[in-house]
């Protein structure tokens, strides 16, 4: 199965004249629920986000952080308590129908009517959005997502991965300039995950702004050019992915040695060195304070013969855990 864009792009790469630079803007967004006990539960607290037009934007956070609440507000499934939200320059309060037409949402839940075929489901969805029959791209979209041969099969007969793709197809029937993917690869195998990644990249390259929530940090690191992290209803980080990855000023060097060692040599004692096995030596250092040349000079002074050397850097998972732990202890801050 191959996922590839068809002849017609889902959205032109350049926005119409006069359109704002940001595809989604939320300012001072708050959502408070009333618990059964009568106490107030704040799901979102003063959220400020600006998602650049044409970006592939990641929204991360632990369970209960507020990600789904934010998405449901943008999809107009949840009413915000206060603040403003605009999609493609359209205010949700002033022009709710126009704002709804500018966004496609792929929910995490596979809520598909089992008694309709994929073709029928897309035709119904297009009708709900007022897409004229002559402008509908039902078979093109199904083909793009590898579902053309299942267009007349009942949805209940589709596999979980096919249903996930069908949810993406439903969100694209009205050619929205903004696409929200809520955990799009949850429960799918590795091959399908890679195929969906490829299709998301193609949509984004064609001009669609993509907002992605995911629990797979590898997915966000692989796809997203900018990431916001939400914890306890607040934005605790919002930066380009590359900048976030530079936040942890830590690297590890692993040396594979030619001869066995009984302990860490004295010239390396000033580094955070650890003998992982008789011929495997690991050193931790901060690139901002220590140059790699200093370490190599110390290795030479210790008389070590190196067979191989690898460098390990912090990944998004390390940063995510550090930020959420810091925020939970009250030392974090909203970005």
Predicted features, each with a name:
Residues 179-182:
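Catalytic Walker B motif of ABC-type/P-loop ATPase nucleotide-binding domains
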Residues 62-66:
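Walker A (P-loop) phosphate-binding loop of ABC-type ATPase nucleotide-binding domains
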